[in-house]
Swiss-Prot record:
Annotated source species: Pseudocercospora fijiensis (strain CIRAD86) (Black leaf streak disease fungus)
GO molecular function per UniProt: oxidoreductase activity
Signal peptide start and end residues: none
Name the UniProt record assigns to this protein: Aldo-keto reductase MYCFIDRAFT_156381
Higher taxonomy: Eukaryota, Fungi, Dikarya, Ascomycota, Pezizomycotina
Keywords, comma-separated and alphabetical: NADP, Oxidoreductase
Family: Belongs to the aldo/keto reductase family. Aldo/keto reductase 2 subfamily.
Domain of life of the source: Eukaryota
Amino acid sequence: MLDTLQKHGHCEVDTARIYGFGSTEEHLAQLKWQERGIAVGTKLTAKKIGPKEYSHKKESLKPGLSESLKALGSERVDTFYLHTPDHNTPYAETLEAVNELYKAGYFKKFGICNYAAWEVAQICELCNANGWKKPDIYQGAYSALQRNIETELFPCLRYYGISFYSFSPLAGGMLTDRYGRETSEYEGGNRFDPNNARGFYRKLYWNEPTFAALDIIRPLAQKHGMTTTKAALRWISHHSAMKGDKGDAVVIGSSSAEQLESNLSNLEKGPLPEDLVQAFEEAWSVVKVNTAPYFA
């Protein structure tokens, strides 16, 4: 899949200490990501990961990052993220420790994920006041079915000069043609399986407003010879609040090289027909009152 990624002119790979309990970082090391010219960003979550428990306290940040670096087989990464807020640790303590790690050369860019806009502002003001490394990137969920970040978060990020990386641009898979109201069978490990530990996606999207929104999008996509996936990726590329000149980017997850090839190709295609753009707007008006908060 790295070959496919680089063939399309991309070099960034996103991972986290919690993904596969560290195994994804180890797998990247086996793939010799550094020799390929890949830029890796990893995240530290304030929770128990396997036998170890992490926080965003000063005494936990360096060991947590060190575990990631060891797994990746590297002395540094391109981006280090705080993976969801640690509300048990004062931000000043965390940010001072992050700044020390930055000055020591462990990473080039600093990122945060899943923080509320007011928290982003507080973080940036603390960093500015103390001369600490300010966040370069905010990573959050954003798709045609989850746009509540547009109202307050995007203006905040623009004010502080922070780029936005969108994960889950297909709303966990709902913006495909795989699922409908009648779906009752799921592949093993499926994120919409109510018996799966990852079934929290079901709580986010498996509801009547979501299916009503899909009823609006899918016929128009079919009319123009597109899958829902293709339409959703073209929407986020051309009709969302994301701006390439601000350093914004889409984080694409794929289970195969073929799927990655398809998703990257769809992101490269042009704007949507106007009636399909309007269908996405109408779909958002249906689901927005039912949308979960963008922050943790």
